[in-house]
């Protein structure tokens, strides 16, 4: 399938697994995540199991989350970082976060 998996690890609940897919351009990343989810469901089905990506399938069990790490580079440099700024956070990062919150 060509999905660049960086690693996996067990999580808090029995049968709960974390899958880390290597970063790529936006469209490739979306494709990798979609293919991975379909692949996991198909493999589970072939083994007589069901895989779910629900965030909370049982109120008495630990939930799951889906999150995406984001970065922004220009000419090989991380534009979110500014060594002189408080906490190393650049103005570009401030604007980027404001856009995420607004839209």
Where does each model-flagged region fall?
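Glycine-rich, acidic/polar active-site loops that bind/position phosphate-bearing ligands
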Residues: 1-103
């Amino acid at each position: 399938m060509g999905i660049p998996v960086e690693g996996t690890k067990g999580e808090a609940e029995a049968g709960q697994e974390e899958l880390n897919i290597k970063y790529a351009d936006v469209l490739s990343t979306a494709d990798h995540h979609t293919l991975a989810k379909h692949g996991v469901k198909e493999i589970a089905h072939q083994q007589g199991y069901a895989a779910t990506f629900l965030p909370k399938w049982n109120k008495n069990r630990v939930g799951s989350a889906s999150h995406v790490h984001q970065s922004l580079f220009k000419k090989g440099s991380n534009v979110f970082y500014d060594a002189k700024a408080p906490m190393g956070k650049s103005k570009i990062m401030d604007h980027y976060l404001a856009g995420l919150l607004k839209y």
